[in-house]
Amino acid sequence: SGSRMSQYSMSFANSMYANDNLVNSWTVDLNSRFTDNLSNQFLFTYSKLDDSRYTNSSEFPFIDILDGGQKSVDGTADADGTNNYMALGYELFTWNNAVHNTVWNIKDDVTYYLGKHKIIAGLNYEHQMADNAYQRNGTGYYRYKSLDDFLNGGIPEVVCLTYGYGGNNNPAARVQYNKAGIYAQDEWQMTPQFKLTYGLRLDGLFFDNSDLMTNNAILGLDYNGRHIDSGKWPNSSLTVSPRIGFVYDVFGDKTLKFRGGTGFFQGRLPLVFFTNLPTNSGMIQYQAQLNATKAWNPQTGKKEGVDMTPFAGGLVVDKDGKPTAAALRDKLISMGYPENITPEEGSVPSAISAVDRNFKLPQVWKTSFAVDYQIPVSFPMSVSVEGIFNKTLNAATLTDWSVQDAKGFPRFNGADNRPVYPKGSTVGTSAYVLENTSRGYGWSFSAQVNAQPWE
């Protein structure tokens, strides 16, 4: 319907927005030395990251007023009544639009020297919460065909509101997990020239399902014997990460060193990927979109339009005469729109996002070998050569469960031998599931020369 800001239309200042990025971080670090051989480090960290949109507007519906079919003064604008003329109110996509991350971590390490051994053992506990809120039309939306309709209490063409189920004023897709780890490492100076380091780390990952609700309509879908439960995060899992490395000073004077190692290493994943599951489950908030022709009608259960005459006479207001989202929500509920939701009342969305119940955080097997050589010249000069090989153990991948297994499908000839998917190769609603894969590897080789011929 044209731009809200052009030579033929205008937007009031309260319909603008900006972004806020707020970071709060706290750290407590306690180092203790009990004896010459025994020490301890206790570390507590807390971080809160809030990325949100804000506006100078107070709570007020967003209102679009169209041109009513009137040509512009110079006669160049279309006169079909679909062009924007005026826009005002709380910006459509800003109310409760935010991503919040809260992380706190407790770590305690004990270091003990025993002869040729330096032993480090510790415990780690981490809690992380991430939520993603997006409430389009959160303060209400009205669209009028003309300025006269708006000023004289005419019937709006469109009314919209997104509201949380169960009276939740700040609905959000939320994920929470707890991660506990225990680890030990030994640095063993076997000889003056050779040091061996080896260790083991165990990590347990535990998700909190309290923020989720099962959608039975989704659960009932059959993807070749597999089902998706929107009310459950991945199962608790234990990750084992052994590691070993060495440094060999061949002549004992650091002129020639061999170093290398191999081990399993676990990484992280942006939790916003996880929040797609509750966001697309349809169990957090309801998006009401009303018009007289194509809107879903709660009275008939059909997409045939809604009687818009209840909205004649101006914006829906509360008992104090203010056009609030709560007042509009109550109006919609009185017209038959849902107030609450249960697992039995869920419906199948246009597309499903999910996380596999056996999903684990990314993990790789990393192996490296390097040579460092000090060239015997009159100034400092060294050469380092290193090779690194990474093998995927658990990587993140997205799979559409509605697409059947391509095994047995015909393939293109030549270099492009992708499978040819025949008609009927998909089943049901698209379901994009975050899974693990062990496929993939990578390697790198580097050579470096450092020289300081003069100071």
Locate each region found by the language model.
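Outer-membrane beta-barrel and related beta-rich outer-membrane complex signature
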Residues: 3-11, 46-66, 125-145, 208-216, ...
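Residue-level signature of outer-membrane beta-barrel architecture
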Residues: 32, 112-114, 188-190, 202, ...
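Repeated loop/turn-to-beta-strand initiation elements of outer-membrane beta-barrel proteins
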Residues: 37-40, 117-119, 194-196, 254-256, ...
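Solvent-exposed loop/turn elements at secondary-structure boundaries
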Residues: 211-241, 245-433
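Outer/extracellular conduits and scaffolds centered on Gram-negative outer-membrane beta-barrels
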Residues: 236-240, 431-455
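Membrane-embedded beta-strand positions in outer-membrane beta-barrel channels/transporters
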Residues: 25-27, 105-107, 181-187, 197, ...
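Transmembrane beta-barrel strands of outer-membrane/channel proteins
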Residues: 1, 42-48, 121-127, 198-204, ...
